[in-house]
């Protein structure tokens, strides 16, 4: 009984600690853009910002195809076998093989598009810089850390990469000619995180590839991965199609103007949704215990809080949109 109580206390402490780390990471995703975007938007101005935005958006879509739905699937399946290193290693080897295959195919298609689609040829240099992230997708292995709930490592890694990005920006980015350098810094930060992940993952698996002749059961993963991927693809297309269409139909100037407003909107949405991880455990607890009355009461409280916070934000944005845009992005916007 004593062991059980200790185990439950440790589990509660772990959940609370993970929740704090998750909130910290959410805060970083808000704070860092509030530092980098106002700085770079004033240096690269509207056209430069639009050029960066279009290339980054195109690359994100290809990166999604390279990664498939492996993160979500890997976390789910990895959590089931994480206490058996042999089984976890087999799962990792199978998912790495799928990820490598999808990455190679995606990268080939990406290169063909860059060199043969007229609009993308205009962004060739920028796309090739951002395209490096596609090649390192298979090395990310984020799902391994998600399966083992290594949120401390994930948070520390994120802090290191983002601090590097901010310092490199301040030291190296000073005028319009640094546009490609800024893209390279952004890419290096992402690639660096993937390289960290790859080498650090060795402690969780025996090897990245079977040391003996062993037939990997790759086919069994394809269907569930593609189902999850379809959901992610629909979401990604919905959120990124606007920038892509603007890029093909208009110029960098209009992309830059649109991206500035979207960037501010996304920062506010991140602030708004940062509360979700705090509410979810309570909601799940009520549902598991079949306490539906308590669930409905708690849900109504959440709804009132969301409306109470969201309505003033929306009203403030409508009334002060020009001033907010000028403060964050600069007068050219």
Predicted region positions:
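Residue-level signature of transmembrane alpha-helical cores of multipass secondary-active transporters
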Residues: 18-26, 60, 95, 99, ...
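Interfacial transmembrane-helix starts/ends
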Residues: 15-16, 53, 85-101, 222, ...
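Interhelical loop/hinge segments that connect adjacent transmembrane helices in multipass membrane
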Residues: 2-11, 15, 179-186, 195-239, ...
């Amino acid at each position: 009984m004593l062991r059980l109580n200790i185990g439950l206390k440790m589990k509660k402490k772990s959940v609370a600690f993970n929740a704090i780390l998750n909130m910290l990471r959410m805060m970083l995703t808000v704070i860092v853009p509030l530092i980098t975007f106002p700085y770079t938007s004033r240096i690269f101005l509207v056209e430069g910002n639009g050029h960066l935005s279009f290339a980054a958006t195109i690359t994100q879509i290809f990166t999604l195809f390279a990664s498939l739905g492996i993160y979500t699937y890997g976390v789910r399946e990895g959590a089931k076998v994480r206490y058996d290193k042999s089984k976890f290693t087999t799962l990792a080897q199978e998912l790495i093989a799928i990820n490598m295959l999808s990455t190679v195919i995606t990268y080939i298609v990406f290169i063909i598009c860059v060199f043969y689609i007229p609009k993308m040829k205009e962004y060739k240099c920028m796309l090739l810089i951002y395209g490096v992230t596609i090649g390192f997708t298979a090395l990310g292995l984020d799902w391994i850390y998600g399966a083992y709930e290594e949120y401390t490592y994930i948070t520390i890694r994120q802090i290191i990469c983002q601090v590097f990005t901010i310092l490199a920006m301040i030291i190296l980015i000073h005028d319009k000619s640094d546009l490609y350098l800024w893209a390279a810094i952004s890419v290096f930060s992402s690639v660096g995180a993937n390289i960290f992940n790859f080498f650090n993952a060795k402690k969780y698996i025996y090897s990245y590839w079977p040391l003996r002749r062993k037939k990997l059961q790759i086919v069994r993963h394809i269907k569930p991965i593609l189902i999850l991927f379809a959901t992610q693809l629909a979401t990604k297309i919905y959120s990124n199609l606007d920038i892509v269409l603007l890029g093909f139909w208009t110029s960098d100037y209009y992309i830059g103007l649109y991206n500035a407003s979207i960037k501010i909107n996304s920062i506010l949405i991140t602030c708004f949704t940062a509360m979700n991880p705090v509410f979810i455990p309570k909601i799940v607890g009520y549902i598991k215990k079949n306490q539906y009355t308590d669930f409905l009461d708690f849900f109504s409280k959440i709804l009132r809080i969301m409306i109470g916070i969201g309505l003033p934000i929306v009203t403030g944005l409508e009334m002060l949109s020009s001033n907010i845009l000028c403060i964050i992005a600069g007068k050219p916007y």
